[in-house]
Amino acid sequence: MATTKQETPQQQCPDFLFEVSWEVCNKVGGIHTVIATKALTMTQSLGDKYILVGPDIHREGVNPEFEEDPNLLRAWKQSVYNDGIRIKVGRWKVNGNPIAILVDFTSFFPHKDDILKFLWETYRVDSISGQWDYIEPVLFGYAAGKVIESYVENFTTSTDKVAAHFHEWMTSSGGLYLRKMSPYIATLFTTHATVLGRSLAGNGQALYGNLA
């Protein structure tokens, strides 16, 4: 009888790992802490092959968490710009100083209907009643997916194991984009809270005691 060969932890570890979150270099809540506190461990393991992707919220001002490096990935940054995507490349000022790519998703505003159409026709994601508090994160996630796709095409080989980890619904369109357009990139999605969990916790219910 044939047996399945078990992979070692080293074989399971990706050669390149991207993490995408609305809270990369942009503190809103607890996800910022989750990612920032793991950055040192990840950079010790993967070095500059561990890359964070977040939104360029401070487009015209100074982001206190981010240090831009105009020489880092300079040629690739220009090629991405030539494709119509504006990004900043630098380091997140947390322990480990990982590479961070901040994406200005506003250039996708004129294409929002095409992007929402793609999500509907491919995955039946219904955006008909979505307002801008929904549309902007969708555009960011989609743009982040395209940035990751471009990086992988330029800097990896066919034997490299590449994974992209998307945090919360605000980035999920990026995972859907890669699943369709770049299926060779493994995708992961993590939700950090649910409506049910927030409701129970907010009303003083013994959530953890009832889990058993």
Tell what function each PLM region has.
Residues M1-A212:
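Catalytic cores of nucleotide-sugar-dependent glycosyltransferases that transfer UDP/GDP/TDP-activated
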